[in-house]
């Protein structure tokens, strides 16, 4: 199979083919197939006969036409307006095994035809290997088809597995990674439902304060960290490093769920006119909006579902998040203020130790803490004081005692059952 060479050859009176003098088709006749078409001045019954002609039996290799894929896709010669708008293209995604063939031949043809590169960037992927990290082939019988995986784990989970593979490296089919992706998708659903539940008034109407209502240090710290994620994830996507973008976003998301949501959930349930409540709600809404958009390229279905609960239109038509979406004054560099960030760091650290104590004692996470004693430096104790109310509420702390000391420590005295 392939594109036939549009060439015929004369057959002399003795039946010998004269390869020295090819018969070429006029340009306005192209394309032609010499195995069925007849050269000018001959008839079909002269094929293979003395004094007649024969067609060239060879075909071009696959790269002869594959090397023109940017031009073919762009409507070259057929749609000049489209071609002017899309060529040169932005990106050629391809695997590493055809760099010297497809990539090289495409660049050469573009240079010869247009004097230009066919695209500005090339993203090199690896192969998808079987679960034993062997190259898949029909002869080996180790081909893994995607449909059963999509049906079992869902499209978002399969996309998560694919997006976890580093550019330029081979990636094995890994159902364990797909299960991780499914858990992430379910967590997005549940965490979003939890967060949006804190934004609803008594009749269920969502009330979202503006971002300038964010005043609590712990809320500002969370949004400050998110601003950094926005900058890093955006830079990764612009460099086609989707795995890095996912890694940074996912890491923040799990910390957001495990620490921040637990710390602010009580405050977010307060009266709407309370500044602390407004701060928590504005921060929750802002963070959720940004996180959904950051995750949308990898988890398109679950993010679209959550977006439809409280936003108009498709998330995939929404603007990509910027640091401005994380609050006023975030700045393009998205630098985190150390003093503000220490509030969230200290609160999360102390809450984690409280949880550990309850787990060790085999007590419910709702079990009250009679006395929580924290020993640390003045700066870290000041950071804890800025989030004291949230730590008390999240940990069920009755009494919080702080002590200055060079040797940090947390003592948890649980209330009697």
Regions found by a protein language model. Name each.
Residues 58-59, 86-97:
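A short glycine/serine-rich beta->alpha loop
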Residues 160-164:
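Non-catalytic, structured segments within soluble enzyme domains
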Residues 69-73:
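Adenylate-forming
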Residues 75-82:
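Cytochrome P450 heme-binding Cys-pocket and its upstream "meander" loop
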Residues 1-64, 68, 112-151, 155, ...:
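Feature 926 captures the class I aminoacyl-tRNA synthetase adenylation module centered on the KMSKS loop
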Residues 82-88, 170:
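Short glycine/proline-rich turn/loop motifs
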């Amino acid at each position: 199979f392939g594109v036939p060479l549009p060439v015929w050859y004369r057959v002399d009176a003795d039946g010998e083919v004269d390869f020295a003098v090819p018969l070429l088709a006029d340009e306005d006749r192209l394309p032609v197939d010499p195995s069925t078409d007849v050269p000018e001045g001959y008839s079909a019954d002269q094929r293979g006969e003395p004094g007649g002609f024969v067609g060239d039996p060879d075909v071009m290799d696959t790269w002869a036409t594959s090397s023109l894929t940017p031009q073919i896709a762009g409507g070259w010669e057929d749609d000049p307006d489209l071609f002017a708008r899309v060529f040169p293209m932005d990106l050629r995604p391809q695997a590493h095994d055809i760099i010297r063939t497809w990539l090289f031949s495409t660049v050469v043809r573009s240079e010869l035809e247009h004097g230009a590169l066919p695209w500005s960037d090339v993203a090199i992927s690896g192969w998808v290997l079987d679960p034993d990290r062997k190259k898949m082939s029909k002869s080996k019988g180790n081909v893994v088809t995607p449909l059963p995986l999509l049906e079992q784990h869902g499209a978002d989970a399969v996309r998560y597995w694919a997006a976890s593979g580093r550019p330029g490296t081979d990636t094995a089919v890994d159902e364990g990674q797909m299960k991780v992706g499914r858990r992430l998708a379910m967590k997005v659903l549940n965490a979003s439902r939890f967060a949006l539940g804190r934004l609803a008034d008594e009749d269920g109407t969502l009330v979202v304060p503006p971002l300038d209502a964010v005043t609590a240090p712990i809320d500002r710290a969370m949004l400050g960290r998110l601003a950094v994620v926005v900058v890093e994830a955006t830079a990764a996507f612009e460099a086609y490093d989707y795995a890095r973008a996912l890694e940074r976003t996912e890491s923040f998301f799990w910390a957001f769920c495990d620490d921040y949501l637990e710390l602010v959930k009580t405050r977010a349930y307060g009266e709407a006119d309370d500044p602390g409540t407004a701060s928590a709600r504005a921060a929750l809404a802002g963070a959720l909006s940004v996180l959904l958009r950051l995750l949308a390229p990898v988890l398109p279905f679950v993010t679209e579902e959550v977006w439809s609960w409280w936003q108009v239109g498709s998330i995939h038509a929404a603007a990509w998040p910027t640091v401005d979406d994380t609050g006023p004054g975030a700045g393009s560099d998205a630098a985190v203020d150390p003093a503000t960030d220490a509030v969230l760091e200290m609160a999360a650290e102390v809450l984690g130790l409280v949880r550990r104590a309850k787990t060790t004692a085999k007590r419910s996470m709702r079990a009250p803490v009679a006395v929580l004693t924290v020993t640390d430096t003045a700066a870290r104790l000041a950071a804890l004081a800025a989030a004291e109310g949230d730590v008390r509420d999240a940990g069920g702390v009755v009494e919080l005692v702080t002590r200055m000391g060079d040797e940090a420590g947390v003592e948890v005295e649980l209330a009697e059952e």
